[in-house]
Amino acid sequence: MALYCGDNFGVYSQPGLPPPAAAAAAAAAAPGAPPASRAPYALADYAAPPAAAANPYLWLNGPGVGVGVGVGVGGPPAAAAAAAAAYLGAPPPPPPPPGGAAGPFLQPPPAAGTFGCAQRAFAQPAPAAPASPAGPAAPGELGWLSMASREDLMKMVRPPYSYSALIAMAIQSAPERKLTLSHIYQFVADSFPFYQRSKAGWQNSIRHNLSLNDCFKKVPRDEDDPGKGNYWTLDPNCEKMFDNGNFRRKRKRRSEASSASTSTVAAGTTKSEEGLSSGLGSGVGGKPEGDSPSALLRPPQSPEPPEGTKSTASSPGGSLLSSAPCLNTFFSSLSTLSVSSSGGAQRAGPGSRHLGIQGTPLSSSGAFPASCISSEAPPDTLQLSNGASSGSGQRSSYYSPFPASTSGGQSSPFGSPFYNFSMVNSLIYPREGSEV
C-alpha cells in the first residue's frame, strides 16, 4: 500500500480520525474493505494502486483524482479532465457505498471542494501561546519593528561625530560664525535627538573641548550686547582640519605640521650658512699677508665661497685680487717644484700639508679652481723644465699641458693645463684632520 503524505505530516487528516498506525494496520488486514467505523474521506480511502501502476508516481499521468481504482492508467481523456476539474474546484463526488470499491487516491475536504482549502489545511496556524506577562503590547519578538517614527530611531543611534566636530558645526551654522556656550548646547540637542536624553555627560565634554582645543577661540562680548557669557569662534588657521560638511579631523594635519617644521629647519640652516660665509669673507679680506694661508681656506661643505673666490671665478680674465695672498703662495710653490732636484726633499711651508703625490707637499690654497689659476698665472710659471732630473720629470706629468701615457687618455674636465690634477679630490675631501 502506498500512503502519500499521510504518515509523516498528517496534512489531510480529518477530525475524528483514528491514529495513522491503526488505519494502516486496518487497511493491510482488509485491503478492499473500509474500516468498521470511520469518518468519510479518511486515511482508509488511500487504497492500493492498480497492478499497472506499481510505481507510486505513475498515477500522476493517469486519470487522477475522482476516478475509481478500476479505471486503468490509460483511461479516456474525458475521465482525466473530469478528475482534474473535480480536484481543482468542482464539488466532490458522493461517497462510495460501504461495500463498494475503494475511494480515490486523494480527495479534497468535504467542507469546501477547493484546492485552496486543502492548502489552508496544510498551513494550519500553530496553537496560540499563553499570554505573556507583558500583555497585548508585546505581540512577539519583533515588536521593536513597530516604531514608525524616525526620531525614535535617531534617539537610539549615536551620531558619528566627535565633540569638536559638533562644536564646529554649531559655530559654522551661526550667521556671525560665533556662538555662546548655551547656544552650542541648544544646537547639538536640536540637531541630534540622541543628546536629548542625558545632557550632563556630553555638555561637560563640550566644555572641555572648548577649553583645551586650540581651534576654538574665546571672543569677549561687546558692551552694547546684552546677555552673559563669552562667544566662541573658530580659528581661521584651523578650518583646514575639518572636512567640508562632516567637520571631521583630517589626518593630513600631521604631514602639514612636518612640512612646516622642515621649512623652519631649512630656513635656520640657510641663515647659519650665510653667517659662516660672511665671517669667512671678512677673514679673507682682513688677514695680513704674513699669516698662514690655511686659515683662509674655504670649507669644502660651505654652499657659498668667500668673496675673493666669487669675484675671481666670475671674472676669470680680470686682475688678481690683492686681498688673496694664498694664490701667490701657490704660484711660488709651483715655481719651486720646477727647479727642485729628485733627491731634495721639499719642506712644507706654513699652513701646507702632505698630499701624497710623489712626496711633494703643496700649499692647501690649491682648493681654488684650476681655471682661475691657469688664467691668472704667468706662462713662465706654468712651464716646467723638460731637462730636469728624473724625479722632476715624473712630477711634471701632473702639470704638463699634454698627459702622459699613464693618464689613460682621459678628456680634460678643465679648460687648463691642470686638467689631470689628481690631487683635486684630496683637496676637496680632506683626509688628515683638516680644519673645517
From Swiss-Prot:
Residues 278-287 have a biased composition (Gly residues). Gene3D superfamilies: Winged helix-like DNA-binding domain superfamily/Winged helix DNA-binding domain. Pfam families: Forkhead (PF00250). GO terms for molecular function: DNA-binding transcription factor activity, RNA polymerase II-specific; RNA polymerase II cis-regulatory region sequence-specific DNA binding. Residues 257-277, 385-410 have a biased composition (Low complexity). Transcription factor required for pharyngeal arch development, and which is involved in hair, ear, jaw and dental development. May act as a pioneer transcription factor during pharyngeal arch development. Required for the development of the epithelium of hair and whisker placodes and that of teeth. Required for hair follicle stem cell specification. Acts downstream of TBX1 for the formation of the thymus and parathyroid glands from the third pharyngeal pouch. This is Forkhead box protein I3.
